[in-house]
């Protein structure tokens, strides 16, 4: 009898390891943390860790997840040993309760990292085709093993940010021709073709695509008031017209603009397939407390860096 009791207790203890928050919900936090959370690196990331622990997400997607600048300066780190991230994400994630860490997309010094309470694995890193397509910062496709056995496909990305195309010979002329918008659109098409485009049943499966798209959406044009054929909309027009993805924030806040950057744009998106959207119970852009971003008063002297980031986090929950 005693042995049976021990086995029952052990079973429930093991089950709790796979419990997904209150009421069985899975909480997902996305954030572009600007230069590897440069703001808090001199503080051993204590404020950052405390903020994440308070939110208690089950899955995190971090963009710009690499240390790049010396604390409180706009001076780039020169030696890899000076960079705490991305090499030590496992140690940092453990401080807010995550046991699994993956560098999902990385082609340069602006990687995307996933951390999770649940097992995860890389499926594909998307950097280009070696010919005429380059994904400047890289993108990635990972799978998270959810409680109960379901798989969540996670696509992370950070598209090219400039007005001119990557490697443009005449940057000024290319910017005038909207080369940056067109380059981002090619990146987006290639990323989708290499990820969700490989799954004929994607709309019936759990897919999430999130990141810094560096592009605004025509669904927010009630705010931007641009011509609908403006090249600024090319990236999200492609997603909306060629994939089953649903813009979560748009659906939860119809007609209500939700900025995700200090500059006042919404360029950080959470896209999910219909199968996942049906399970989403809440979604929001976080702009209070530690996430209340502002520009460093030193301005251009410090590259217009912000504290703690120039982007706001996006948080959503779903029930598997």
What are these regions, as identified by a protein language model?
Residues 25-38, 124-126, 151-161, 177:
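Active-site-proximal beta-strand elements of phosphoester/diester hydrolases
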Residues 151-153, 179-214:
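His/acidic metal-ligating clusters that form di-metal
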Residues 3, 18-95, 107-109, 310, ...:
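N-terminal, active-site-proximal structural segment of metallo-dependent hydrolase catalytic domains
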Residues 164-182:
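A solvent-exposed, charged loop/short amphipathic helix patch at secondary-structure junctions
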Residues 6-16:
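Bacterial N-terminal signal peptides
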Residues 32-34, 66, 158-160, 213-216, ...:
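Catalytic metal-binding/acid-base residues of hydrolase active sites
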Residues 63-162:
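Structured beta-strand-rich core segments of catalytic domains in phosphoester-bond hydrolases
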Residues 197-208, 214-320:
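Metal-dependent phosphoester-hydrolase catalytic domains
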